[in-house]
Amino acid sequence: MKFAFYTLGCKTNQYETQAMEHLLLEKGHEIGSFEEACDGYVINTCSVTAVADKKNRAVIRRCRRDNPQAVIAVCGCYSQHDPEAVRALGIDVIGGSGQRQAFVEMLLDAAGEKRHEEQLDNALGRREFECLPAGGLEERTRAMLKVQDGCVNFCTYCI
């Protein structure tokens, strides 16, 4: 199957998108462009501001409108923060801001059987680091490497 990714927001989202692409490639799937026909589309969202939320909704709506037969999956802070709004947009797979390996498995299950899947958790209660593969070596001179996951409620801008 062929999947495409659209990433909004921070370096963590960029890293996690690269890791999910890597996981799909390891399983024998292809990664395509968001503008071409694919079996599934993943939108990794940001929710740091109201403007970011508006961009999320616009990208999700456009993707659903342009690809009515494809599986559309949304993960990241927006779906973690407001899963009801994401459900209302008719999304097939909804994941939060963690558990990327499980999210990829849900994506593959939904794409194979065209069914709805959800996996959300308490982001602030998450204490275990999810080890994901480093990515970005093909297109960049530097790879991103995630060294921390979770939160101790110290930042004022994060969800």
Residues covered by each model-derived region:
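Proteins enriched for Cys/Gly/acidic motifs involved in redox and nucleic-acid/cofactor modification
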Residues: M1-I159
